[in-house]
Amino acid sequence: MANFIFSAFADEIDSNFEEQLKALKELNIGLIELRGVNGKSFIELSDEEVNAVKEQLDSYGIGISALGTPIGKITVDGDFEAHKKLLTRIMDIGDVLGCKVLRMFSFYPAEGMADDTFKSVVFDYIQQLLEMASARVFIL
């Protein structure tokens, strides 16, 4: 018989992080794909709040399967440099929380952009993100 590892977004259970962890524990789910914490995205947390999240996770014995990031959730004509800075912050948080796996999105095309141009830009953007992530041993 196969063994399965369950992980869940818990911010759809409750916006309160403590309640999320309680529910996961009750359901015997040992991993969370972290996204929302106390009504905001984990990427909006201060360093102190990130440390508190780590303490709560540890106290419940719950690990993180992946960080549910918004990386790639912009149009290709958006501010990619700001997006790269966001990736850096996300990796800083991942280091504190002990999670090296980042969920990401595909990029959205710019209005009127030709398919070949879109494909080329997306491949370039993903290559840049991969270089950043691999330098810090993160998986996109």
Regions found by a protein language model. Name each.
Residues 40-43, 73-77:
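Short active-site-adjacent helix-start/loop capping segments
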Residues 17-37, 93, 97-98:
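Catalytic domains of carbohydrate-active enzymes, especially glycoside hydrolases
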Residues 16-19, 56-59, 76-140:
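Active-site acidic/histidine proton-transfer and metal-coordination neighborhood
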Residues 10, 42-43, 80, 119:
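A generic secondary-structure micro-motif detector
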Residues 1-16:
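Boundary/entry segment of secreted carbohydrate-active catalytic domains
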Residues 33-58, 106-114:
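Glycine-rich, proline-tolerant flexible connector loops at the mouths of alpha/beta enzymes
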Residues 9-13, 35-37, 67-72, 107-109, ...:
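Active-site beta-loop-alpha junctions enriched in small/polar residues
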Residues 3-7, 31-33, 61-68, 99-103, ...:
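Structural preference for beta-strand elements that scaffold enzyme active sites
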